[in-house]
Amino acid sequence: MKRTWQPSKIKHARVHGFRARMATKNGRKVIKARRAKGRAKLTA
């Protein structure tokens, strides 16, 4: 059986990347929350 996680940097960035986050209101909220928390890494 094929495993469910077949990593692809492009796919990952398109869904979870910075530009993907900034494209929606809720995504911007995520970035804001992560900045407030002091995360070193904001997005994937």
From Swiss-Prot:
Species of origin reads Mesoplasma florum (strain ATCC 33453 / NBRC 100688 / NCTC 11704 / L1)
Q: Which InterPro entries match?
A: Ribosomal_bL34 (IPR000271), Ribosomal_bL34_CS (IPR020939)
Transmembrane parts of this sequence: none
As for family, the record states:
Belongs to the bacterial ribosomal protein bL34 family.
Q: What is this protein called?
A: Large ribosomal subunit protein bL34
Q: Does the keyword Ribonucleoprotein apply?
A: yes
What PROSITE patterns does the annotation carry? RIBOSOMAL_L34
Q: Which cysteines are joined by disulfide bonds?
A: none
Which gene name belongs to this protein?
A: rpmH
What are the protein's UniProt keywords? Ribonucleoprotein, Ribosomal protein
